[in-house]
Every structure is written in structure tokens, then in C-alpha cells.
Amino acid sequence: MDALPLVQTDAGQRLVGHLLRHHRRYLSGAIDPDVRFRDFQNHVVHVDEGYWGGAPRVAHQWYDRMLRYLRTDRFSDAAHAAGVLSHYFTDPMQPLHTHSCDLEAVIHRPLEWSILQSYESILADWKSDDMRVVFRLSDRSEWLGEAVLHGARFANHKLARLLA
């Protein structure tokens, strides 16, 4: 939801309106991959293991589903699909979702809990940082998968610092 103010196109603003109107469905969709689907192999892109993981594929599936719902005026369902999509899109941007090892398994939950507890501070720091990462999305049909893979590669560069 924090990214919604960054949306700039008219079509994007219409989608933002639907997401805000159906925010409960959006938010429930955002946690469904963890609590309902529990398909954790689809939350990752292991960069150093030949890009193993299903995040790009499943993100495309939920994106297509969201578009189908939008075209048929099923805006509540579209908001839910957008929430699910947001999970599969952002999880590979967490460095520990880009590699698997024994140490990663030990620190994963505590790190995610710490991020959750510090989220407001992290967001404020990001907003005030002139060096923050904002990437533009392509108009090409492959844009979504490319963005997920790019995010995973970027996150993977931060992995060694977390595991040190």
C-alpha cells in the first residue's frame, strides 16, 4: 500500500482506486501465500542456483488473473489477486529469499520479524534517501518476470552482509 502514491499513470490511478476501495481483500491476498497457499518454493529466486524458485512464474499467473478480474469488473477479486501478486513480486527482493544455506534457515524468521518491527523507520529512511532504489517498469510483455529477477539479483548482492 505504501507504493500506491508512486503510481503515475491514469490507468494506474484507476487501479489504485479499486485497491483502496477493496483494501481488506488486497491485504488478505498479500498474506495468503504464507498462510493459505504455503507454497514457499514460489516465494524465492535462488540466484546462485540457476534462478531456482517459482516467484516469476507464479507472479505472472496472479498478474494475469488480476487483469482478467479487472476486465470483468470483479474489482474485489482483482484487489485480492493484486495482493497475492504483491507477495510473489516482493518476496524475492528479500536477500534471504535469494539463497539457501543452513545459516539462512537460522536467521530467516528473526530477520523478518525485525524488519516488521522496524518497518516504519525503514520506510522513512527510504523516503528521505536520495540514493533509494526506484526502478521503472517496462512496456514489454516480459516486464514482470524481468522485474522479479532484477529485484532478486539486487537483493542477492546484499546477502553476504546479512550472513557475515
PLM feature spans:
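N-terminal, motif-rich segments that launch catalysis or mediate targeting to/interaction with membranes
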Residues: 1-80, 95-164
